[in-house]
Curated annotation (Swiss-Prot):
This is Large ribosomal subunit protein uL11. HAMAP family: Ribosomal_uL11. It comes from Corynebacterium urealyticum (strain ATCC 43042 / DSM 7109). One or more lysine residues are methylated. SMART domains: RL11.
Length: 147
């Protein structure tokens, strides 16, 4: 049986897909744990090349021998909603000022994209979670079936 490596740290970052560089925030976060930063940036950029333009969260597990593993997550729901609504940012006063609209079908598409990371039993429940995020950003959801 292979020996288990001892975990030294778990680092969570949100980095632009295919564009990780040793500059902040990547360099200082990994350098503090003695990880080879260039090796990580090359591996991350290769793994996220197909998702260029999105921000892709990553969980980096650093072991005591300074080796590492990383697990990619799905892009944040807020970023996907902004892209779907064609906006730069959400509302500063979400329940008063509405800044955009998305359809229920767009919420379902985003829920399908985020399915591995969502805590939902099916796509409809996932879409409801996404719709809640949209509301908290000042984005109206049109065509939502009533409960």
């Amino acid at each position: 049986m292979a020996k288990k490596k001892k975990v030294q740290a778990l680092i969570k970052l949100q980095i632009q897909a295919g564009a990780a560089t040793p500059a902040p925030p990547v360099g200082p976060a990994l350098g503090a744990h003695g990880v080879n930063i260039v090796e990580f940036t090359k591996a991350y950029n290769a793994a996220t090349e197909s998702q260029r333009g999105n921000i892709v969260p990553v969980e980096i597990t650093v072991y005591e021998d300074r080796s590492f593993d990383f697990k990619l997550k799905t892009p944040p729901a807020s970023k996907l909603l902004l892209k779907a609504a064609g906006l730069q940012k959400g509302s500063g006063v979400p329940h008063t000022d509405k800044v955009g609209k998305v359809t229920w079908d767009q919420c379902k598409e985003i829920a399908k994209t985020k399915e591995p990371d969502l805590n939902a039993n099916d796509i409809e429940a996932g879409a409801a979670i996404i719709a809640g995020t949209a509301r908290s950003m000042g984005i109206d959801v049109e065509g939502r079936p009533s409960a």
